[in-house]
Every structure is written in C-alpha cells, then in structure tokens.
Amino acid sequence: MELLSALSLGELALSFSRVPLFPVFDLSYFIVSILYLKYEPGAVELSRRHPIASWLCAMLHCFGSYILADLLLGEPLIDYFSNNSSILLASAVWYLIFFCPLDLFYKCVCFLPVKLIFVAMKEVVRVRKIAVGIHHAHHHYHHGWFVMIATGWVKGSGVALMSNFEQLLRGVWKPETNEILHMSFPTKASLYGAILFTLQQTRWLPVSKASLIFIFTLFMVSCKVFLTATHSHSSPFDALEGYICPVLFGSACGGDHHHDNHGGSHSGGGPGAQHSAMPAKSKEELSEGSRKKKAKKAD
C-alpha cells in the first residue's frame, strides 16, 4: 500500500475499479468470446443448419461463467438471462459475426490491432468478474475459502470449464479436451487470481481490492495481448511450474520409469531364470538317460 501511495496509484486504481463495464467492456467480451466460437471446427456450418443451437453455444460462451457460479451457490441457473440488455447485445454480436454480409463485421474485428484492443478489454471484464464472484461467495460463506476460490475461478473461466458441455450442443464429443486436464493460460490465471482475491477478501493480503484489481488487470492484459499478438498457446506460468511441480508433486515420468524398471527386472529375471533352468534340467535328464543306456549295455 505504501508503494502504491508513493507511485500515486491509489487514486488511479480506485477510479479504474469504478469504471462501468456495460456496454463497452461487455461488448468487447462478447465479441472475443463469440470469435473463439467461430474458430471452432464446424461452427459456421452449425450456424447455417441449426441457428438455435449456434445461438445457445454463443450464449454459453458469453454467460457460462454466471451459470456455473449460480450452480455452485445454489441459485437459479437462468438468473442472469433476466438481464435483457446483455442478452440482446450478445445476440446482436452473434448475428453480426456469423451472418453479416460478406463477413464484414468478422473481418473488422479479426483485424489484429482491433482484436488486441478487444482482447485487452475482455481481460478487464474477466478480472472484475473474479473479484465480484468472490465477494458474492463471501456474502454466503464468510469462512468458506474453497467456496470463494471455486466461485471466483468459474467466474473467470466458466466457459472453458464448460467446454465439453458446449461441444455436446454442437454435436461434438471430445473428452480429451477437458479443460481441467489441459488448463489454458486464462484458466490457470483465473485460479491464481481467485486465490489472491480470496486472501484479500479474508484480510490475509494487506492490499485494497481496487489496487489488486488494477495490478492483476495489468498482468492479465499484458500477458494475453502478448500471447494473442504472437499467436502463442504457451503460458507464462510454465517456467515456474516446471520448477515447483516436480518438488511438490514429483516428476510425471519418474514414477512410471521406476515401475517400468521394476517390472522389467521381474520380467527380465523371470524368463531368464526359466530359460536358464530349462537347459539345466534338460542336461540332467540327458546325463541320466545316458547313464541308464550305459547300465543297459553293461547288463
């Protein structure tokens, strides 16, 4: 806090946290979310053959985080769909991206400099949703740390966590694309951000919520814009996780290698012992047979 005061960021952070998200930031969030839907294989054909299914998929991309959060907190799953302004705005974006003549709207928002602006604004919405989700969960469960973390996490990356269900709506089933097994950068960042905001909400992190929102938004915007501009699918956390995870959880291939060697030693010893025992046994039988023959000749 003293550092933020020295840098005169306290007032800026407070003003930034009070900026309304609707309609400009929400519009950017809807545009980027539905763009990613159109990138999915078969999404364009689905919009032509089954427009209702395509619209439902678009609404999941835009509001899936709210649905999951309501599910966790035991609230009506369709509660957010009572927000007519957001639903109409998201529906208009879906129609323009999929059905605009000559794909003019799609080409404009896909132009990289324009797209980077929308991506940056989407991360502003993501961080704010994490903070609001944790505050909402804290209202119901004052000491439920894991509930707050889970709610903030799904608020920030709900659509990714619902990817398998969204695929079913498109008639696709890819269980290997489970987001929990293969977390993308936004999903990991949402989880880490949910932990930070939970610590701040429970007063274990000595920083104001406005300052944390401002700092974490800068981090998310910088990383996501860089990854989008370079067309990279890597994560800034990979290097850190590469050092920490083997220490805390062991190497992923170490245990398998040990078991393979262990099994190999048994399998190598078993057949080898059998092969070595078999010739020894046959030699004894041969020698015994030769002795019997000699005894018969002697008789």
From Swiss-Prot:
It is a multi-pass membrane protein. Disulfide bonds: none annotated. One of its GO terms (molecular function) is metal ion binding. It catalyses: K(+)(in) = K(+)(out). Residues 40-51, 107-144, 200-209, 256-299 are cytoplasmic. It comes from the Eukaryota. Channel activity is activated by a change of voltage within the sarcoplasmic reticulum lumen and blocked by luminal high Ca(2+) levels. GO terms for cellular component: extracellular exosome; nuclear membrane; sarcoplasmic reticulum membrane. Keywords: Calcium, Ion channel, Ion transport, Membrane, Metal-binding, Nucleus, Potassium, Potassium channel, Potassium transport, Sarcoplasmic reticulum, Transmembrane, Transmembrane helix, Transport. Residues 260-299 are annotated as: Disordered. Homotrimer; conformation seems to be controled by binding to diacylglycerol (DAG). Belongs to the TMEM38 family. Intracellular monovalent cation channel required for maintenance of rapid intracellular calcium release. Acts as a potassium counter-ion channel that functions in synchronization with calcium release from intracellular stores. Opened by a change of voltage within the sarcoplasmic reticulum lumen. This is Trimeric intracellular cation channel type A. It comes from Homo sapiens (Human). The gene is TMEM38A.
